[in-house]
Amino acid sequence: GSGKSFTMMHKDNGIYVLACFDILEYLRVYNGSQGNNSKFLVPVVSFFEIYGGKLFDLLNNRQRLQALEDGKGNVQITGLTEKQISSVDAMLNLIDSGLTLRAVGATGANADSSRSHAILQIALKYTKSGKEYSRISFIDLAGSERASDVQNSDRQTRMEGAEINKSLLALKECIRAMDKSNDSKSGAHIPFRGSKLTMVLRDSFIGNSQTVMIANISPNDKSCDNTLNTLRYADRVKELQHGKGGIIKFNVLKMGQNAADVILGTARDDENDVYKAGIVGVNAAPSQQARVPPASQAPITARQIQQNLPQPHYNPNYNPPNSKPAFEPRVETTDEDDMVRTHCDLVDSIYEQEDLIVRAHRRQVDSMMQLVKEEVALLHAIENDQVSIDDWLVKLSDILSRKEEAITTLKGNLSAFKQALQKEEELSHSIDLNKARKK
């Protein structure tokens, strides 16, 4: 990889460690200057990952989490474990335990590549009330190869790459929308709901917040295109300014400004306004970074970019139903960009179907356990002459019918899921053939 996780997590000079040193030192001075104990602040750490469009708590054995919006539009991570720390070593121990649970895997360029976005949050809370004073988030983005480069990999790696690329494209779309909002009098819709990543990062992009993006690039000639793409990406972020009416405040941290200045200094101006900061690591190669042109150029269309994902379109008024029919990919297309987009959409659909089937399987198991209890009671009754043969036959027939119905329903769901996986395999093969014809 290009060093994203190394930059964020190195135990001596990583961003996590340096920021924690600064924050704890400032807290020591800050709390020492407060005469009232009710104003004392303590640091609280949480650590979770986004994998396959799902959130997992890395401090609680990868328990599933939910990202929900409250009445004020703020994103809340329900069920997230928070641990109070008193030293850098305590934070490193928590991170080490969390990293053992993080999703990693081999790719074409890295034998131990991060396959999830890892988010470490350090929140400052009042000791007496528990109210949050400010928060800083560190996002170590997943490493992902270009879509056309991972097609020869196994299905799991392909699906991981497609989901990662989708979230990075959603992040790029949010940055573009914020740029347009700054230029527009009325403001533009910002599609934060385009992915779980952008939902979680929402607080770091709007309101009383600052964000720094770290662009990691690889020093070799094979990564030249990816390096340029990442630099364009970072340049677009750097050009963002204050939004209209103070709605968007997207500030670039100044050289020499440390994490404690961000999380303590600025927040002190308004103790009633929770201050949030975000630090995002962006890699260049070998990854699929969305190609963002410089601000002075017109947006580049998907067809103008070789081996790059196209621009997604988001409908802010769309409310997803509880379930939806199986996705039908356009396998017959010959345009590689269209095929990659179709593959990305299909993978997204497969992840959603997987969730539905897992829940259906859980319901089927619960139903079977209840039916087994009824069957055992019925068997005990007939053995002890507590029920007539006719009643026993009727009740046993009913139990067997309900078992059969539950199994048939689950098998139908599995059949549809297998078809979606087969279509993913066929589409991946089509992309391989299309790429081979171009060589």
Swiss-Prot record:
This is Kinesin-like protein KIN-13. The keyword Secreted does not apply. GO terms for biological process: axonemal microtubule depolymerization; cell division; microtubule-based movement; mitotic cell cycle; mitotic spindle microtubule depolymerization; negative regulation of cilium assembly; plus-end specific microtubule depolymerization. It comes from Giardia intestinalis. Belongs to the TRAFAC class myosin-kinesin ATPase superfamily. Kinesin family. KIN-13 subfamily. The lineage of its organism: Eukaryota, Metamonada, Diplomonadida, Hexamitidae, Giardiinae. Transmembrane segments: none annotated. GO terms for molecular function: ATP binding; microtubule binding; microtubule motor activity. Gene3D superfamilies: Kinesin motor domain.
